[in-house]
Regions:
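N-terminal glycine-/serine-/threonine-rich beta1-alpha1-beta2 phosphate-ribose binding loop
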Residues: 8, 12-16, 22-117, 250
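Active-site-lining helix/loop region of Rossmann-like oxidoreductase modules
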Residues: 27, 31-35, 173-302
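Short, ordered loop/turn segments at secondary-structure junctions
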Residues: 57, 102, 127-130, 159-160, ...
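Short, hinge-like loop/turn segments at secondary-structure boundaries
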Residues: 69-73, 141-143, 172-174, 199-201
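A short hydrophobic/small-residue beta-strand
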Residues: 121-123
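Rossmann-fold NAD(P)-binding glycine/threonine-rich loop
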Residues: 127-151
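Short alpha-helices
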Residues: 148-177
């Protein structure tokens, strides 16, 4: 995405197709103008789309031109304050919204619900939104129901879509028998936005990490399920990926657990993303392992 020729197949009608946006560029509005937005807005422009607006909560960027934010010449599109988001969307009438703000569904709910309310297709880099049904089903259903009412699509995507998802299912599809799927992935939280860094516990002392991040894993399956149903569960990224893999492969989840371990560094290290120095021995991030057992006898560990 975005595409200049969108093929729309209408259900319950004789087969026909309509080409939209033949004579104009796809109109995109950007939610959040941080590190990830610099890339997503550039990608939109490179693929022939048009960024018609941008929305942010940070007073330091409100009123700035998006060209300046991207390190380009000014483009005549200024960042709008979040409180004016609905008015901005109604005025600009975008085809697509890109939401690159936070990592948890509860934190992007308002933006996604607004898009659903106004019938604007939205895609988000929120990691939980990749497959939120197994971590926050209540909010997921709220967004899903509203999007269906207004006829738009709300979806989560990103790195995991290809490398933790489609790539694995493609390989699995060529395999005669599977007993276990095991994988690992590493990345530098400094290369991403502050939402990802905070979700990984970066900058916390080990005691803070234990209380705020790791403690959620030291509970029974029944306790975890209650927290999930309450909408307060804090999933690691692989929690949602494992759920996605099971759904895609037609596997029935019997149990799923996660364990998070802080990573540290022997010296003080400055983080431009956090805007502070992480002390030696404090958490620079985390290692998360999610293990899923299925009724079909296949284990997924990632």
């Amino acid at each position: 995405f975005p595409c200049q020729n969108l093929i729309l197949f209408q259900p319950n009608l004789p087969y026909r197709k309509e080409r939209l946006f033949m004579d104009r560029k796809v109109r995109v509005i950007q939610f959040g103008t941080g590190k990830m937005a610099v890339y997503t807005m550039r990608y939109v422009l490179e693929k022939g789309g048009e960024v018609v607006g941008a929305i942010d909560v940070n007073p330091n960027v409100i009123g700035k031109d998006i060209g300046t934010i991207m390190g380009k010449t000014e483009m005549g599109v200024k960042v709008t304050a979040l409180e004016n988001a609905e008015e901005t969307i109604r005025t600009l009438k975008p085809d697509i919204a890109i939401v690159t703000t936070m990592s948890l569904l509860n934190d992007v709910k308002d933006a996604l619900m607004l898009c659903a309310k106004l019938g604007v297709n939205a895609i988000t880099t929120c990691e939980e939104a990749f497959f939120p049904w197994n971590s926050n089903p209540q909010v997921t259903k709220e967004i899903d129901d509203l999007a269906k009412q207004t006829g738009c699509t709300i979806t989560g995507s990103g790195y995991q879509d290809i490398y933790w998802g489609q790539l694995i299912t493609s390989i699995a599809g060529s395999t005669q028998k599977i007993t276990k799927i095991k994988g690992s992935s590493s990345y530098n939280v400094e290369d991403y936005g502050i939402a990802l860094a905070k979700a990984h516990g970066s900058g916390l002392t080990l005691d803070e990490f234990d209380k705020q991040v790791a403690s959620v894993d030291r509970i029974s399956d029944e306790e975890r399920q209650k927290i999930i149903e309450s909408g307060k569960y804090l999933p690691s990224y692989m929690w949602n990926v494992n759920g996605w893999l099971c759904s895609k492969l037609g596997l029935t989840v019997k149990s799923q657990t996660q364990k998070t371990i802080p990573t540290t560094y022997k010296e003080d290290i400055y983080s431009s993303t956090l805007g502070t120095t992480v002390k030696a021995g404090d958490a620079t991030g985390m290692s998360a392992v999610v293990t899923t057992e299925t009724e079909e006898g296949i284990t997924i560990e990632s």
